[in-house]
Amino acid sequence: MAVASRLAVARVAPDGGAAGRRRRRRGRPVVAVPTAAGRGRGRGGAVAASPPTEEAVQMTEPLTKEDLMAYLVSGCKPKENWRIGTEHEKFGFEVDTLRPIKYDQIRDILNGLAERFDWDKIVEENNVIGLKQGKQSISLEPGGQFELSGAPLETLHQTCAEVNSHLYQVKAVGEEMGIGFLGIGFQPKWALSDIPIMPKGRYEIMRNYMPKVGSLGLDMMFRTCTVQVNLDFSSEQDMIRKFRTGLALQPIATAIFANSPFKEGKPNGYLSLRSHIWTDTDNNRSGMLPFVFDDSFGFERYVDYALDVPMYFVYRNKKYIDCTGMSFRDFMVGKLPQAPGELPTLNDWENHLTTIFPEVRLKRYLEMRGADGGPWRRLCALPAFWVGLLYDEESLQSISDMTSDWTNEEREMLRRKVPVTGLKTPFRDGYVRDLAEEILQLSKNGLERRGYKEVGFLREVDAVISSGVTPAERLLNLYETKWQRSVDPVFQELLY
């Protein structure tokens, strides 16, 4: 690729997790530079960003827009190499008090996992802020939400085994400390002021910026949890079809997995408050991306969009430089006021792409971002739902045909209303539940044709759609009856 030949660089992670082997690009040796922390086993694949990486050597020539496009294009891979990457977040809490756990408790859990289960530590400013093992990583969201970014795996059986192994490890370490983990989409009991702040430079920048661009950004950062799946594409055309399908159906997934009905101890008026929060977090970098449905859409159009999303930061010398509101286009010509003369590397571009939060996000794979966090069976069901739809040609074509005449207004209406009314949201001459039934059947058919006996992972989805009762409505019913209008029992109900 033309990009590689112009970079004399070594990738170095802040944790020292650079690949410790010699590699050649066009005859030029590129040596990864190790640092003190961690043994840096493995990198790559469809996993979420750990702390940002940086290039050890300055750029010799400016990046071009073609380089930025080539980065995305490099994600194209043949079907036999498609993988499934699952990420989920959860709230840690003290079992005795139900209070959110503080950073020092989280640090002890991370250290315990590292010692007992052989994870490598990721350190920032002498604070342990994550773990890595092979192609899996554990990271901390701004309020201490504990995230597993799974390895790219071939089957849903492997995905579910990975989730179960992780939950077992976290439970084993946490229980000894009187700490539990909760699978829900929004913090049900505690106020923003009760949530601890993690010692990560990136989050400090975001925390200061969020109130300037939306009213709910701090809630998004500190009080939400999600589960998402990352999926591959074979070509630009395949990416476009999957991107459009993912955006059109994201509100349907939001309805099926709606699981955030409480806020500060009482019902909040939504089935998925987490989903609603994204509608007023920062509309420059979130939403339903109507341009994806334009005939002209492709990798280049997404690059143009991403270039226009205001920056958050540049990462240099293990420090974050606040560049909030600045333009990546200015950065490309060395005109960032905060870093004059500094030119971006591909790693800066990679980092910038992680600061964009639409309902479906394009990196070198596609991320489905519409579902609330939930109990472990739903952590297996969410990737199953999307794999059945997007990794089977027949199902993908059926869904593409089914959604091809949906208008931007209809997609936006679903995006706005589903967080409130879930499966009962009217759509054309029926309801979202009717759509969900049809889509579920296509997902089941797609999984059947894959031939890995994966359809069983959709049982949770089947139960929700056949009953018409979302997880959130089930919790609200318990709140009004068995729980006697207290949210405290949810910590036991949805304990991992």
UniProtKB/Swiss-Prot annotation:
Q: What class of enzyme is it?
A: ligase
Kindly state which reaction or reactions the protein catalyses: L-cysteine + L-glutamate + ATP = gamma-L-glutamyl-L-cysteine + ADP + phosphate + H(+)
Task: Please give one Gene Ontology molecular function term for this protein.
Answer: glutamate-cysteine ligase activity
Pathway(s) annotated for this protein in UniProt: Sulfur metabolism; glutathione biosynthesis; glutathione from L-cysteine and L-glutamate: step 1/2
Q: How is it modified after translation?
A: The Cys-160-Cys-380 disulfide bridge is known to modulate the enzyme activity according to the redox status. The oxidized form constitutes the active enzyme.
Q: Which Pfam families match?
A: GCS2 (PF04107)
Region listing for Disordered, in residue ranges: 14-53
> Which pairs are disulfide-linked?
C160-C380
- EC number(s) stated in the UniProt entry for this protein: 6.3.2.2
Please give a single GO biological process term from the UniProt record: glutathione biosynthetic process
NCBIfam families the record matches: glu_cys_lig_pln (TIGR01436)
Q: How does it assemble?
A: Homodimer or monomer when oxidized or reduced, respectively.
What protein am I looking at?
Answer: Glutamate--cysteine ligase B, chloroplastic
Recorded name of the encoding gene: GSH1-2
